[in-house]
UniProtKB/Swiss-Prot annotation:
Gene: Ranbp3
Name the record gives this protein: Ran-binding protein 3
SUPFAM superfamilies: PH domain-like
Region listing for Disordered, in residue ranges: 1-177, 255-292, 438-491
InterPro entries (alphabetical): PH-like_dom_sf, Ran_bind_dom, RanBP1-like
Modified residues (Phosphoserine): S32, S33, S40, S58, S146, S257, S277, S279, S296, S463
Subcellular location: Cytoplasm; Nucleus
């Protein structure tokens, strides 16, 4: 190859100079800017600045001095070609265009090309190997090299090609798949296919990274696809979990457990007597292990229920021999002499009862009043003939009655509705009048009858008085007659 380059160099050299001058003013579509190209060269660590741009930094000068033979792809050359006034700098400029196959392209431009279009391709990676133009072997590059340099290039290429070839072939296959994927892209169209494609690409990238751990593989993230895959996984996971549990299923097995029943039975046996505990333990042993919910609940309530059976007691109120005539809801007041005011005793049911007397069978009545709720006795008095009763107002009656607390006669006020007050007043008035008439009759019956001798003496005395009066009258009349007789004789 060195001999071939030496033979073609004088024939092709002028055309190469003219071709690079015209080519230097055009930029490839894959490159973004001269600054971006220079940054990529800096990141690669093999940057060789052109002579036209004068750098003042020490880094560029040190790199320019220490730079030897460097392999750079011709697609990464940016900027204009050197002017025609500097022909001596042309060989150094031509050192950047080196014969290099497509499999040996640097990986760093691929990372830059993926970061820019990632937002537009919806996460589908487009490596720089696919977008950038493929390098071709030009005879001009061979003509610009010296025989020693071309020999060194061939030696280095032979050493580096076997190391990069497997990875390069995988990248070429991966590039062809990714070129077919983003063609005619519409947002949201065939989203499932893209998910599958990304999964396949990820698997291929994993295989490549496992084969070549030193190579840098870009990771394209698409949040829409991640959300769809995570939601699908969650849906399947929730569906699997929902089929496992059903509410209310096998409730008897969950509620009924033999240890808990034994504990409950032991508690009840402690509270009950020894005889009851023995009977319950025998019944539990005879009972089957698995019972229904209703049966177990009935057995539990029966075991824990305390049957408090009270003896029936006959209620005695003292009104068993009486007949109720009238009962009303009212409020009772008592007159306090010290404070000269009415004090409430309580409210409840006032009953008017009639009863037969044991002595002579006469009718007697009494008033009984108990408080509502507690049934405490607050009034218990009999009706008598000298009992005073008057109607204080349309809804109240004032009576005198015996007090059950101090057994003295006090003045009470009964307050109720107008209808109940009228009925009570009429019933009390009728019974009090009957008691008064009966009392008068008793008094007349109890008075002693007059004696017969005494009546005769009185009659004789009366007759004597009449006789005494009669002679005096007669004598008076005789004298009068005598006077009359004397008078005419005298005349």
């Amino acid at each position: 190859m060195a001999d071939l380059a030496n033979e073609e160099k004088p024939a092709v050299a002028p055309s190469v100079f003219v071709f690079q001058k015209d080519k230097g003013q055009k930029r490839s579509a894959g490159s973004s800017s001269p600054e971006a190209g220079e940054d990529s060269d800096h990141e690669d660590g093999n940057y060789c600045p052109p002579v036209k741009r004068e750098r003042t930094s020490s880094l560029t000068h040190s790199e320019e001095k220490s730079s030897g033979f460097r392999l750079k792809p011709p697609t990464l050359i940016h900027g204009q070609a050197p002017s025609a006034g500097l022909p001596s700098q042309k060989p150094r400029e031509q050192q950047r265009g080196v014969l290099r196959p497509a499999v040996l392209q640097a990986p760093q431009p691929k990372v830059l090309s993926q970061t820019v279009p990632s937002s537009g391709t919806n996460g589908v990676s487009m490596p720089a190997d696919c977008t950038g133009p493929a390098t071709s072997v030009s005879p001009e590059n061979l003509t610009q090299r010296s025989p020693s340099e071309s020999a060194e290039e061939t030696h280095t290429l032979e050493e580096k090609v076997p190391q990069k070839t497997p990875h390069g072939t995988s990248e070429e296959g991966h590039c062809e798949e990714e070129q077919a994927a983003p063609q005619a892209f519409v947002f949201g169209q065939n989203l499932r296919d893209r998910v599958k494609l990304m999964n396949e690409n990820a698997s291929v990238a994993d295989v490549d990274s496992a084969a070549h751990p030193s190579s840098e593989t870009p990771s394209a993230t698409n949040y829409f696809l991640q959300y769809i895959s995570s939601s699908a996984d969650n849906a399947t996971h929730s569906a699997d979990n929902s089929t496992k549990f059903v509410f209310g299923q096998n409730m008897s097995e969950r509620v009924l457990s033999p240890p808990k029943l034994n504990e409950a039975n032991s508690d009840t046996s402690r509270e009950t007597t020894h005889a009851q505990s023995g009977s319950e333990s025998s019944s539990q042993e005879a009972a089957p292990k698995k019972e229904s919910l209703a049966e177990s609940a009935a057995a539990y309530t029966k075991a824990t229920a305390w049957t408090c059976l009270l003896e029936k007691v006959e209620v005695i109120t003292g009104e068993e021999a009486e007949s109720n005539v009238l009962q009303i809801q009212c409020k009772l007041f008592v007159f306090d002499k010290t404070s000269q005011s009415w004090v409430e005793r309580g409210r409840g049911l006032l009953r008017l009862n009639d009863m037969a007397s044991t002595d002579d069978g006469t009718l007697q009545s009494r008033l009984v009043m108990r408080t509502q709720g507690s049934l405490r006795l607050i009034l218990n008095t009999k009706l008598w003939a000298q009992m005073q009763m008057d109607k204080a107002s349309e809804k109240s009656i004032r009576i005198t009655a015996t007090d059950a607390e101090d057994q003295g006669v006090k003045v009470f006020l009964i307050s109720a509705s107008s209808k109940d007050t009228g009925q009570l007043y009429a019933a009390l008035h009728h019974r009090i009048l009957a008691l008064r008439s009966r009392a008068e009759q008793e008094q007349e019956a109890k008075a002693p009858p007059p004696e017969p001798g005494a009546t005769r003496a009185t009659e004789e005395e009366d007759s004597d008085e009449d006789a005494v009066l009669a002679p005096s009258g007669v004598t008076g009349a005789g004298t009068g007659d005598e006077g009359d007789g004397q008078a005419p004789g005298s005349t």
